[in-house]
UniProtKB/Swiss-Prot annotation:
Domain of life: Bacteria
The protein's role, per its UniProt record: Attaches a formyl group to the free amino group of methionyl-tRNA(fMet). The formyl group appears to play a dual role in the initiator identity of N-formylmethionyl-tRNA by promoting its recognition by IF2 and preventing the misappropriation of this tRNA by the elongation apparatus.
Family of the protein in this entry: Belongs to the Fmt family.
Source organism phylogeny: Bacteria, Pseudomonadati, Pseudomonadota, Gammaproteobacteria, Pseudomonadales
Any Pfam family matching the protein: Formyl_trans_N
InterPro entries: Fmt, Formyl_trans_C, Formyl_trans_C_sf, Formyl_transf_N, Formyl_transf_N_sf, Formyl_transferase-like_C_sf, GART_AS, Met-tRNA-FMT_C
Protein name, entry field: Methionyl-tRNA formyltransferase
Amino acid sequence: MRIVFAGTPDFAATALKTLLNAGYDIVGVYTQPDRPAGRGRKLMPSPVKQVALDTGIPVYQPVSLKPEEAQQELASLQPDVMIVAAYGLILPKAVLNIPTHGCLNIHASLLPRWRGAAPIQRAIAAGDAETGITIMQMDEGLDTGDMLLKLDTPISADDTGGSLHDRLAEMGGKAIVQAMERLAKGDLTGEVQNEAEANYAHKLSKEEGHIDWSRSAQEIERLIRAFNPWPGTFTDLGEQRIRIHQASALKQGSDKGPGTVIARERDGVDVACGTGTLRITSAQLPGSKAQSINDLINGGKQVLLPGQELN
């Protein structure tokens, strides 16, 4: 079966490597154009492109798939199926119709929950008990196509956006291989999504990481985990922007206003929240690396002291 793979970041690269290791015939790889990265802002290939280069697969990097020439180029590959994972380009209906079996998407949620760009982080921030991978038959909507296969995983109390991303990337590879095996046997059937259960995982922004201390400690703790490693969470102490890397939610409340530091011990800094108390255990001061509160105290830093106001 002739497969065209379309994807860009590490999540997609993991699935591509799994397909290659399973012996599938990838006749072409579509990925985003090279982007500037690093201190030198040098043009760098996407993780998916790097896998393709390492394995000798032809790479295609159109800015858009809307032009007829781009669609003709794809059609010339004569794909039986196109597998899409975090590609980053909209696929017009004409493209969806080119492969014999259409386009299959690897989506990092249990659809119809968390359609959209940031399902991994949104699931953690919302306090979901589980998430997973859905293999979906793509249509013209945003993650609205028929569901073909699902794998689920619990979200643990210490999962971060990073740890859950890596686990789901591995699961995505397993799921698409299972789907391809069923497709070859002719028993891959779709289930229509229930629109009443659908919600959207909107794209993340850096500003969303600004901690609102009027929220509950539990909500803030989940946000810190969800946004680790990107876009990260932060709070301001006067003119200083302090990044928060790890924290835990405590049930006990305080008579202090939200954002007030109420204690600083070696095991953490306690901050009053709208409900409960947040214990910060790892933070990053301007111009410094992330460090434990114990190390921060050992360094003599006079920040995050009782009575100080964070906002």
